[in-house]
């Protein structure tokens, strides 16, 4: 009963989670040519969700240059969120991530992409969403995510509480269909769709 209750609580709101592996098939679908693992070494002065400023601050004090690219998270094994991210390129051409993140430590899966620079709005980095299956409810759900992210970029990161509430309300109407899709497309040995980090057969199956 305890495990079921915990899983039910997580499933009420699916969380994006870090995939343990990104297959070559998935990378092609995402349009990613190069994926590398970058050492995470948070700078003492760095703030979460502030990677570009963190990198620029680090470079001012220690040298190096900015390397832009993408990091990845998964929703219910049915969609991928690609978040633009900045890391430090050291003089020896190695990369380090200096931004703290409670969900990622050790090594960060990172796809270098200098074209991200053209997508930056007032130092705010964009996200992209890619559906892994063809379903209208999922397309509608992702469209809400895209709209919310565009508002974030256009408003320099400040989104009114009333706007957020409207986004959440619209998304909640689609949520039952999204949850059913996640259950349907998660195998027993896949990472559980709820984002717990456990295999499905030991979690929400």
Predicted regions and their residues:
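A structural boundary/capping signal
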Residues: 1-193, 198-202
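Phosphate-coordinating loops and pocket residues in cytosolic domains that bind phosphorylated ligands
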Residues: 205
């Amino acid at each position: 009963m305890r495990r079921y209750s915990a899983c039910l609580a997580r499933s009420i709101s699916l969380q994006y989670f870090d995939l343990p592996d990104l297959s070559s098939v998935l990378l092609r679908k995402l349009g990613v040519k190069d994926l590398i693992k970058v050492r995470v070494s948070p700078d003492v002065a760095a703030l979460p969700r502030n990677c570009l400023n963190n990198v620029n601050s680090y470079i001012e004090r220690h040298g190096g240059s900015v390397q832009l690219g993408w990091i990845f998270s998964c929703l219910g094994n049915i969609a991928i969120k690609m978040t633009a991210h900045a890391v430090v390129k050291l003089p020896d051409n190695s990369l380090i991530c200096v931004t703290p993140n409670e969900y990622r430590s050790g090594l960060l899966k990172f796809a270098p992409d200098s074209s991200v620079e053209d997508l930056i709005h007032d130092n705010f980095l964009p996200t992209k969403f890619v559906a892994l299956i063809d379903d209208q409810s999922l397309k509608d759900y992702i469209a809400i995510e895209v709209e919310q992210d565009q508002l974030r970029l256009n408003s320099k990161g400040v989104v009114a509480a009333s706007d957020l509430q409207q986004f959440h309300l619209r998304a909640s109407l689609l949520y039952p269909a999204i949850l059913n899709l996640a259950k349907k497309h998660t195998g027993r040995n896949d990472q559980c769709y709820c984002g717990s980090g456990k295999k499905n057969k030991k979690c929400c199956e």
